[in-house]
Amino acid sequence: MTRLVTLELLMAGIGSALLCFPDCILGEDTLFHEDQDKGTQLDSLTLASINTDFAFSLYKKLALRNPDKNVVFSPLSISAALAVVSLGAKGNSMEEILEGLKFNLTETPETEIHRGFGHLLQRLSQPRDEIQISTGNALFIEKRLQVLAEFQEKAKALYQAEAFTADFQQSREAKKLINDYVSKQTQGKIQGLITNLAKKTSMVLVNYIYFKGKWKVPFDPRDTFQSEFYSGKRRPVKVPMMKLEDLTTPYVRDEELNCTVVELKYTGNASALFILPDQGKMQQVEASLQPETLRRWKDSLRPSMIDELYLPKFSISADYNLEDVLPELGIKEVFSTQADLSGITGDKDLMVSQVVHKAVLDVAETGTEAAAATGVKFVPMSAKLDPLIIAFDRPFLMIISDTETAIAPFLAKIFNPK
């Protein structure tokens, strides 16, 4: 009988003051140095572009399935967890995972990918003064399952994966063990990650990310008021609306994509990019999401005086069963009886049965807490006679990024902040 590996992914985030992971911690412009045997290097900008490509590809799949719902997830959390699985995958199973994560295996060898992730996660685990970040992996292994020592050692060395034994025949106790661990690691933000646990389960892989930061320019709670938010054709909903006046912050108006882009910075090396499509233009902006678009926006941002900025205060969450979505990105074999995960047990007796991802994003006055060129025209404020007022009173996108590497650990669409 084929045993099942249940892969659980977790992510939590808040968006008012926050930090991002990758290079905010890196003082170098590469994620890892040249290997003694190979001359291949994966620089941070390339890794950021690859991560962004995966993020936008997955986002489009999730948004298409839920066009009138909030979307929030951590592409970094998901890719790191799948990369751990790829450590034990062989042949086509391994290639599908890494290529599904948008890596080009002819340009970047598998060993360099793992080394890059390992270096990144190691840097992220270092304590920060201005931002709280916690990220890691945990393996919950059926006590009767024999896992190769080499796999456990690599998972621990590269991905800081802790290993625990569990009795999945006692599903209630095993579920509590895992959920309690996740709750503790995410400061209580993620509760009940696993709701169902099959008795055939042999292993559960949990990835978590938690971060908390503060806005560089915080909102004054005394200025927050009830205002209307317009979600499509529905009647507007009342939401707490935060307000900033006379704010100097990076801004650009994209005339080609019909959207406004504003960057709000956190204390530390992180920022949140808010993309506000014009009325009825959300699908146009979503269809154009790709690494080049994000790069163009960031290159075009200029410090500008915004007379009034309105942003809803919100807390949103989402749960995803990604085993139904990842095959659309080319990751198929690991979910079938053709899966080759022999690098985990030494036998081809494992397959992935479930990939669960849960994200929480809170945006408030003080900050964010988490447990996730052509056509771009900058309009100089000196040329504007009318005051610049930007109101996020309709669906918008939010991308949390590291300001040094441009990696986006969290991506969200706020369709209804209430």
Curated annotation (Swiss-Prot):
One of its GO terms (molecular function) is serine-type endopeptidase inhibitor activity. The lineage of its organism: Eukaryota, Metazoa, Chordata, Craniata, Vertebrata. Induction: By acute inflammation. Residues 1-29 form the signal peptide. The record marks M381, S382 as: Reactive bond. GO terms for biological process: cellular response to cAMP; cellular response to glucocorticoid stimulus; cellular response to interleukin-1; cellular response to interleukin-6; cellular response to type II interferon; response to bacterium; response to cytokine; response to lipopolysaccharide. Belongs to the serpin family. The single human alpha1-antichymotrypsin gene (SERPINA3) is represented by a cluster of 6 individual rat paralogs. Liver. This is Serine protease inhibitor A3N. The modification Phosphoserine is found at S93. The reactive center loop (RCL) extends out from the body of the protein and directs binding to the target protease. The protease cleaves the serpin at the reactive site within the RCL, establishing a covalent linkage between the serpin reactive site and the protease. The resulting inactive serpin-protease complex is highly stable. Variability within the reactive center loop (RCL) sequences of Serpina3 paralogs may determine target protease specificity. Gene3D superfamilies: Alpha-1-antitrypsin, domain 1, Antithrombin, subunit I, domain 2. CDD domains: serpinA3_A1AC (cd19551). It is found in: Secreted.
